[in-house]
């Protein structure tokens, strides 16, 4: 084994040394295996990933970068798909209409899944100038100060294929855009032009992590100059305080499902009202500020944003208890406050966030104030070779929790092992007002996956 490992290292070293001047590459091979230990038990993924990063420097002021991602999930090769993605609470099987073919008995629920693929994650050209930089291409831009919170950081939409359980960089959907930075003293001025308009990507229909879906009649926003997204950011450190101001004119990443109802009042004649869904994306204007200040071992940080143009789902109770759905446009404020410190050699972080809907009315399905909290702890042991971590997120209004303890073992500079558990708690959905019946139209974000707790292991080889 020692000789084999030496030959592999020698091969990679020789390959890198033989590359043309200015060409660099790096990447990793990784296996992610997850086991759901609640009935029905199953290996929910045996995902193998190959990532390759290539950079070429033409001249010191011009650099091309690409990051590709190839994956294959072996779990579907040796397990039944209906075991990997069991039926969730409030889910039902739609029988075929007359004349339609019978469903596949091996996939009677018509579960969608993506077992393999090749993705171009990032591809951009960097232009470096004395007082400015330009980045053109497919990229990820993160504006937030408080790690992990989407208050100011709303540029790239999210991939919910695996809920929010993937690494942060894997959750962001890269967009084609132009980013320009201009440096003036302690300040950086940043501008964005984003012609690539996309929304959040839901998990495949009826897959293990399926929750929200894009409605069938949804028409994406046409990609043209008029429909582009625009953003600006000013950042810098003044008087020991990190400060950020952002402004983003963008499309809502969650399409609004406008509903029109005809035939109301005909129920007594045995005629059901007809509901027509018209999913559309709406423009939002988001302006915000972020601050961070260090006081010795304690760092206080926060962000606040004012969002204009948001549409919220509404539910009116008609005579006889029937629901009439609609939408209401209301601005909202979102903020997060955080504190970070070091205690007994451990990095600790505590955050509290609120979404506040202005001019709220009782018919809006979301609470006027939504409260969220998180706690993160991390400590390096044995010179950094062992790193235990704990992340806890709670949606306070509905008493939902996500617990993520994990242990990272750095075997060498190139080989890393990771062991962890994901635990969801909470009710799968909110109750219909005045009843004990769960409302299938108001699924909870964490509680819906209360039966999907899992243990997982990752093995990663970097080069």
Q: Each predicted region: which residue ranges?
A:
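Membrane-embedded beta-strand positions of outer-membrane beta-barrel proteins
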Residues: 27, 66, 136, 180, ...
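Outer-membrane beta-barrel "beta-signal"
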Residues: 439-463
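Repeated loop/turn-to-beta-strand initiation elements of outer-membrane beta-barrel proteins
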Residues: 23, 61-64, 131-134, 186-189, ...
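Residues on the lipid-exposed face of transmembrane beta-strands in outer-membrane beta-barrel proteins
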Residues: 50-56, 66, 122-127, 178-182, ...
């Amino acid at each position: 084994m020692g000789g084999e490992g030496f030959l592999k290292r020698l091969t990679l070293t020789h390959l890198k040394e033989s590359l043309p001047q200015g060409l660099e590459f790096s990447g990793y091979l990784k296996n992610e295996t997850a086991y759901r230990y609640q009935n029905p038990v199953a290996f929910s993924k045996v995902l193998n990933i190959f990532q390759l990063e290539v950079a070429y420097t033409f001249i010191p002021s011009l650099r091309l970068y690409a990051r590709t991602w190839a994956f294959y999930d072996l779990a579907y090769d040796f397990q039944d798909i209906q075991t990997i993605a069991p039926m969730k609470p409030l889910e039902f099987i739609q029988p075929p209409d007359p004349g339609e073919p019978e469903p596949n008995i091996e996939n009677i629920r018509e579960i969608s899944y993506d077992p393999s693929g090749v993705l171009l994650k990032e591809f951009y050209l960097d232009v470096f100038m004395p007082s400015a930089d330009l980045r053109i291409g497919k990229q990820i831009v993160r504006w937030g100060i408080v790690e992990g919170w989407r208050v100011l950081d709303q540029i790239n939409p999210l991939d919910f294929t695996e809920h929010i359980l993937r690494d942060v960089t894997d959750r962001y959907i890269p967009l084609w855009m132009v980013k320009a930075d201009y440096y003036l003293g302690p300040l950086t001025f940043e501008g964005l032009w984003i012609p690539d308009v996309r929304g959040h990507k839901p998990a495949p229909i009826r897959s293990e992590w399926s929750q929200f879906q894009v409605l069938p009649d949804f028409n994406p926003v046409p990609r043209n100059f008029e429909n582009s997204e625009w953003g600006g950011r000013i950042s810098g450190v003044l008087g020991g305080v990190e400060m950020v101001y952002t402004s983003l004119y963008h499309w809502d990443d969650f399409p609004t499902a406008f509903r029109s109802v005809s035939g109301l009042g005909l129920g007594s004649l045995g005629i059901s009202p007809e509901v027509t869904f018209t999913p559309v994306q709406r423009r939002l204007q988001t302006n915000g500020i972020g601050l961070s200040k260090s006081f010795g071992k304690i760092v206080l940080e926060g962000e606040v944003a004012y969002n204009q143009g948001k549409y919220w789902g509404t539910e009116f109770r008609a005579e006889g208890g029937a629901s009439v759905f609609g939408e209401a446009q209301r601005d909202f404020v979102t903020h997060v406050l955080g504190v970070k410190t070091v205690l007994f050699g451990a990095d600790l972080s505590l955050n509290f966030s609120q979404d506040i809907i202005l001019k709220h009315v009782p018919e809006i399905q979301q609470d006027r104030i939504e409260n969220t909290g998180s706690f993160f702890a991390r400590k390096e042991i044995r010179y950094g070779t062992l790193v235990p971590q704990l992340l806890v997120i709670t949606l306070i209004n509905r008493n939902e929790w996500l617990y993520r303890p994990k242990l990272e073992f750095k075997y060498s500079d190139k080989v890393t092992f990771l062991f962890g558990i994901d635990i969801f708690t909470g009710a799968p959905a909110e109750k219909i007002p005045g009843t004990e019946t769960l409302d299938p139209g108001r699924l909870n974000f964490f509680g819906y996956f209360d039966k999907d707790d899992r243990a997982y292991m990752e093995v990663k080889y970097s080069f």
